[in-house]
Each structure stands twice: as structure tokens, then as C-alpha cells.
């Protein structure tokens, strides 16, 4: 209540006769994002109450969008408020241009912005207000499993059996694009082969890479040879493969929790999400955490004529009731039950490998290695040698063989 009153007071002050302030925002609430409309509505409500103007540039959170945001920061063209990835290799390059929440709270104590430890950066500061706790898992069209008598993929053996049944029936077993957004597949197969300790290790030299990471990449090749993926997996898009799943032309899809919002109402009781099964049957870990949050940039903070307006916008967007509007998932039935069960497993969650990789290494792993390993043009050993040559997790002394591949 105290925070809400403080925010109302700021908005009232801003609404007094004065020159309108112009603010620039960038977010991932673009394209087909399920929260895009709610985000735009919140911006318009802020404009109506404050008299200020918000110029928003939202996009879809793919690799090109990430690169565009990072390029703008590098060029000194950062926005005033940003909704972006948090506590990851993606956020590291921009932190020096962000304002720690502790600094904002010190100047606006009644606003009491939440400082979540889960998003505490290496320097000890929290810069982002979190939204969208997430998980990654295996989405399953249970009606297709019933129709074809396939076992649910709750073990690796059942997964392979289901792949064989659906391939024989002419149904795509696992809908994925190996050329567009392959990171869910890569992360989940490495996890399937790893213990939580192995998965969460961050090697700084090639000989430190867990053997389970090699086995995880080999699982991609194994699934490819089993015919688990679409025939055009090497040259199709994620939009196309996701539509195959939604239209019940594919039995499974590995994806993030945000995928639930794109599923049609008629699938609420015929689609569930479950953990990717472990290849050795031992690990119960799942990939998850908090992926994104709202930031305030130093550019607007250091501008006395616009600081109050920007802080008010940050407070407005991150009010608890407004965060619920942005995080709303319109799902019901079996899908909602399974998604809630996955989201509740916070003790089992491990952070994605790619979140801690630098951009060049991440792109080499996901966009070069994954398709090449899948078809057999590159071995898992060659893959990790090429990735580690780019020091994905920080400084290293690369072995000559790895360095030569750079």
C-alpha cells in the first residue's frame, strides 16, 4: 500500500501543468508475445495519468533482437527503460549503463522497488525487477499418444519408443528447427545426460568440459538418426515447427514455459508439459529460473528533467498487480496443472548453460554446432573444442588444438 501511494503521488506531481516528458522504452513484448497487448495498455494508462509520452520499440526476443539491443547500448543509443534478459551473459555488457535498484530505492524510499536475490549480479547489485519465472520442458500432445498407443515420454526408453511409433505413423515425433531456435533442444539433451552438478559447471578449459556435455550433444545426433525431427529441420523456422505441434501434426516439442500461451483453447486438456527425461534415469533436474526483468538506464537517471518520470514509469510497470497482468497465462485444464507442477519445482531448477556464455560462443554452439552434430558433419568433441576456443565462460588458456579451431 505504501508503495502504491508513493507511486500515485509521483504521478500526480507529473500530471501538474508542465512540459510533457518523452521517454523511450525497449522490450521483448513484441510480435506474437502473449503479453504484448497488456504491455501497450499499461503504457497508454501511464501516459493518460502522467501526461508524458512513451515511445516504445518492442520486438521478439530472438538472437537478432538481443544483438540489436546490445548494439544500441554499445553505440550510446540505449533507451530510458528496458525489459531485457537478467543475470546472464546477455545482461553483463550493459550493467555499467544501468542503475542499481538500491540506488533508486535510496532516492525514492517510499517506492520500495523489490531487490530479488535471484537476479543479483556478480558485482553484488540487483539491477532488474523480475518478471516471468520460467522453465523449459517437453510439451506433449497426449491425444496423439493415446491415438497411436505410444508411451508417454517419462523415461528415455519411452521417449525413443514414442519416436519410433510416430515416425512409422507419419507424425513428426519432435517438432524443432535446427537452424532457427535450437537452444531448447541443446540445453535439454545436455541436461538429459548430466547430473545437476555437471550441468551447472562452467568450464574454463577444454579438458574441464564434462563428458556428459559431449554425451548430450551425441544425443542430438542419435535422435536425428532415429528420425525424431521434421524432414526439413535444417532449413525451417521455429514459427513453422511450432505450428506443426499446435495443429497436432507433431507429437512433442521442447520449449519454454511461455509456449503455453500460444496453444489453442482446444488443446488445454490434450497437451501437457513434463521434464525432459534423463538418459540414465537418475537426474530429476529441470531447466528454469527468472529470465527477464525491467531496468532503468543511467542515461535517464542522470537527466534531472526526466528522472522522476522514468522512475514513475518503472514503478508503474512493476506494481504487483501490473506484473500479474504482464505474466498472465490464459491456460486451463491438464496443461495448466502440468505447467504449475513444473513451475513449482524451484528446488530442482538449474540455470541454462547459454545464459552464462558470451555471445560468440553461444552462437557457435547453437547455430553452428547443433545442426552440424545432428547430421554427423561434426563430432561432439569437435563441437566443444570449437566452443571452448571462444572462452564461453571467461578467460582461459586454450590448448593449441582448440585455439587452432578459432
Tell me the role of every PLM-derived stretch.
Residues 85-136, 151, 160, 185-188, ...:
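Hinge/lid segment of periplasmic solute-binding proteins
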Residues 72, 80, 108-143, 172-173, ...:
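A structural signal for short loop-to-beta-strand junctions that line the ligand-binding cleft
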Residues 21, 44, 48-49, 147-148, ...:
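Extracytoplasmic/periplasmic substrate-recognition and gating elements
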Residues 121, 328-397, 401:
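C-terminal capping/gating helix-and-loop segments adjacent to ligand/active sites or protein-protein/ligand interfaces
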Residues 163-165, 203-234:
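Glycine-centered hinge/linker elements that transmit conformational signals in sensory
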